[in-house]
């Protein structure tokens, strides 16, 4: 999430001139010739990227990689590249990876000054706080005068400063290079609260020594629209990634799931569903793909709700703003027409 991307590093990249570097070429052709997608993954982030008991990678970011692979190959062919917050964008800029699947807040500076293109919001998040149940802090207002653990050089650190300044509240930040060290410091009583995006805190809460002794405060202090990113200057690849993510949202809107996609392909009377699933039209060709590209995505990875329930359901995370627009949320697919 936002904490996983270092703003200080982004400034260094800009200073070095990498943001204005030319595109590395036709990414789709490169991926097809190579025979697999190179996908960066930040390790040990429950709900987003982790390894399960069977030794398999799982999480929303992992599923995003699978979505792109399914669209391109009709199969899951991925080389996962472990990264840190400090290397995320430099690897993408250099061409060492093909896409950044998630974890980036879509902000003005990242969109205009980093040589990146974002491909639509896939997760609406917000920055919150983890505190001890036994303490005096029961609301964000109670954080006045608190010591707060936060990841250094991130949008989280900037949000913290902006919010406390705007509300004339005092705080002392204890900064760390990554989330794990910040949580360790919080558990060692070096700070009164730990801050991160609520989705990330929810995933990590169960990893604490005594999770029942902690709680997430109600409310958030920021808006974090999360989106995948690709290199600027490669419009065909951007379109492919953007429409692949739209396909999983459109599938949920149309009632097409991993469980019923074969039946819906045969029986759906919806013209948009038939276009999406490749029954007629040549939408795949317009992306440089086979006409069953979206069918393959849904068959192999599922629609948005399939992915949410698989990755966030076990964490008890409510979809909230990530519900479909028809259910009172903010998610809406661009039309397939």
Language-model segments: which ranges?
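Extracytoplasmic small-molecule ligand-binding "clamshell" domains
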Residues: 25-103, 283, 287, 304, ...
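Bilobed "Venus flytrap"/periplasmic-binding protein-like clamshell domains
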Residues: 38-47, 57-72, 105, 125-181
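Bacterial N-terminal signal peptides that target proteins for export
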Residues: 1-10
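Short helix-initiation/N-cap motifs at beta->coil->alpha
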Residues: 78-90, 173-188
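C-terminal functional modules
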Residues: 273, 277-337
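Acidic, polar ligand-binding/catalytic clefts
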Residues: 66, 70, 74-142, 198-221, ...
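Extended ligand-binding regions for polar small-molecule ligands
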Residues: 62-70, 133-137, 141, 146-147, ...
């Amino acid at each position: 999430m936002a904490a996983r991307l270092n703003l200080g590093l982004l400034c260094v990249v800009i200073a070095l001139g990498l943001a204005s570097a030319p595109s590395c070429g036709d990414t789709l052709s490169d991926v097809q010739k190579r025979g697999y997608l190179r996908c960066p993954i930040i390790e040990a982030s429950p709900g987003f990227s982790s390894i399960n008991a069977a030794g398999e990678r799982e999480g929303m970011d992992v599923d995003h990689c699978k979505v792109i692979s399914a669209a391109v190959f009709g199969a899951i062919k991925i080389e996962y590249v472990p990264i840190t917050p400090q290397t995320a964008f430099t690897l993408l800029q250099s061409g060492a990876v093909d896409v950044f699947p998630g974890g980036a807040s879509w902000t003005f500076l990242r969109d205009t000054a980093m040589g990146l293109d974002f491909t639509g919001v896939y997760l609406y998040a917000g920055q919150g706080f983890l505190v001890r149940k036994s303490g005096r802090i029961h609301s964000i207002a109670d954080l006045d005068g608190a010591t707060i653990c936060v990841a250094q050089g991130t949008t989280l650190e900037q949000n913290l400063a902006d919010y406390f300044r705007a509300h004339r509240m005092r705080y002392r930040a204890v900064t760390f290079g990554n989330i794990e060290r910040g949580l360790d410091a919080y558990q060692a009583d070096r700070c009164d609260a730990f801050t991160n995006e609520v989705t990330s805190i929810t995933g990590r809460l169960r990893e604490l020594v005594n999770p029942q002794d902690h709680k997430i405060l109600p409310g958030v202090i920021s808006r974090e629209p999360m989106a995948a990113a690709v290199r600027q200057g490669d419009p065909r690849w951007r379109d492919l990634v953007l429409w692949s993510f739209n396909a999983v949202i459109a599938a949920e809107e149309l009632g097409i799931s991993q469980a019923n996609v074969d039946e819906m392909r045969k029986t759906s009377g919806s013209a948009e569903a038939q276009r999406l699933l490749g029954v007629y039209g040549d939408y795949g060709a317009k992306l440089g793909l086979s006409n069953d590209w979206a069918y393959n995505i849904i068959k192999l990875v599922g629609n948005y709700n399939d992915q949410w329930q698989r990755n966030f359901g076990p964490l008890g995370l409510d979809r909230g703003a990530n519900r479909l627009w028809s259910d009172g949320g903010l998610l809406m697919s661009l039309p397939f027409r």
